[in-house]
Amino acid sequence: MRILLFTGKGGVGKTTVAAATAVRSAAAGHRTLVMSTDPAHSLADSFDIPLTSRAQELAPSLWAEQIDAQERLESNWRDIQEFVVAFLNWAGVDAIEAEELSVIPGLDEIFSLTDVKHHVDSGRYDLLVVDCAPTAETLRLLSLPEAMNWYIERIFPVERRVVKTIRPLLTKLTSMPIADDRIFAAVERLHRNLDGVRQLLTNDRMSSVRLVVNPEKMVIAEAKRTYTYLSLFGYRVDAVVVNRIIPDEVEDPYFGKWKDIQAEHLETVKESFQPVPILTARLFDREMVGLDLLAEMGEEVYGERDATDILHRDEPLRVRKRGTSYMLSLRLPFTEKAEIEVFRKADELFVRVGSYKRNLVLPQTLQRLEVKEASFVEDRLEIRFAREAGTPARTGTT
């Protein structure tokens, strides 16, 4: 099975490109489901067909759904939310305010990703096309499972043991709500679901991200930052789609300057993202809405390509042995050395780029070694691990 995620700055046409990809895949005989995690819910507008939160067939081999984020929030967060509301009520917070405060902003969008795992597990489809929210929201979505994974593995077991130990005493001393096993089980269940999604989306044999851009300076700049942060968290970009290019046959002098500007920006995209394939779509003379026009756009974008293929293979993170040392290499395109912060604590390596931080749990082979040096060469952060001089080798599993 393949999973394709489409994202880009708001207004670039990512929903249209995602829908066109799904239509083209279905026409080739691949059982295709396209789903939207974007709160704007433009997918139904793109097909010009009303959609629900359940997959519905639009054409042979083509299904679509527009996720009800509130519904997913209630099914994933209900037990935890009830506890948080009870705690806030005990603390004197008004009931309505407690209800509002019990939901972390963005959780509804995050839970919509759990549908990805559900559809993969079902085995009903050959391709899952995900129309993601604009880039900032998508990055938050894709970075949360890893952050939660760190919390569950490092902090959660300690909290659970402490609460279990002191709960009998606290219930005698205070009326404050105390988390019970049901709440902890809900947190663990949520973690399993989100971590399962993370493993699927970082599987290089299954999942790819496709960035959609317009040939505009600010849009391209945001796409570069997005590519950097996706690489930081291990997500692979296999294509960039440049949408709404003014075609050569437009000869009106009003568009002459625009065509020159677009040509310059298109060259920038090709130079910046190489060797990632650059796909293009012209600015059509109408709205590309409905199955027939989306099929036309799919032909425009992919040409002779199979839309479901892995169009480019990248390796954001790799560990290789070099002599007696090991080199951990993390690809960080469009990054300056001064923007990167790296430090190690016990068996973890922390890498920060801009406002995003990733905690890498080192494999056991590297846990036994010391960091000797770090360098930034040709868009890769290279960190060399080796034993201290005179330190005997220790056995263990990788």
Segments (PLM) and residue ranges:
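C-terminal lobe/tail of nucleotide-utilizing enzymes
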Residues: 194-337, 350, 355-357, 361, ...
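Hydrophobic residues embedded in beta-strands of well-ordered beta-sheets
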Residues: 62, 326-328, 347-349, 381
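Beta-rich strand-turn-strand
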Residues: 338, 367-390
